[in-house]
Amino acid sequence: MQTIILGGGCFWCTESVFLSVKGVQSVISGYMGGDAVSANYEAVCGGNTGHVEVIKVEFDESIVPLEVILDVFFATHDPTTMDRQGNDVGSQYRSVVFYTDETQKPTIDRTINKLRDMGINVVTEVHPAVEFYQAEDTHQDFFNRNPGQAYCNFAIPPKLAKLRKEFSQYMVS
């Protein structure tokens, strides 16, 4: 089992994508990367903690390799715009990969370089993982528990459609 932490905008959206990927054992929404010694939704959304909304993804690499996890991540968010994902603006929405094992870094670097070789100006930050602050229970499995939420209904279905189109062999049936 491997773990990687991904920040690609609102964690409700990234969580929904990765809950749909075969081999993903758990997805936990949370906060990471800031200077504040604690984190909660209100403080992080205020933009003053330095933390990012992230998801901690635990996956079985014999089912879904890290390369695919990263390809899904980069395909389902905008890695080219600093501190913004759609209407969500602020450093708490920046694109970032936190690796939990040094052996993951070369794969992350290769994936980003592959995108850059294709002319994509990736601004995604890459850092070793630091303390992870789990988000409040209300933010876990958010879209599945709040199917009528307007923001989610606007932002998540296009990401899931892209996942279905480009990574159908890795989607949970």
Curated annotation (Swiss-Prot):
One of its GO terms (molecular function) is peptide-methionine (S)-S-oxide reductase activity. InterPro entries: Met_Sox_Rdtase_MsrA_dom, Met_Sox_Rdtase_MsrA_sf. The active site is at C10. The keyword Oxidoreductase applies. Keywords: Oxidoreductase. It catalyses: L-methionyl-[protein] + [thioredoxin]-disulfide + H2O = L-methionyl-(S)-S-oxide-[protein] + [thioredoxin]-dithiol; [thioredoxin]-disulfide + L-methionine + H2O = L-methionine (S)-S-oxide + [thioredoxin]-dithiol. Its EC number is 1.8.4.11. It is an enzyme of class 1 (oxidoreductase). Gene3D superfamilies: Peptide methionine sulphoxide reductase MsrA. One of its GO terms (biological process) is protein modification process. Has an important function as a repair enzyme for proteins that have been inactivated by oxidation. Catalyzes the reversible oxidation-reduction of methionine sulfoxide in proteins to methionine. This is Peptide methionine sulfoxide reductase MsrA.
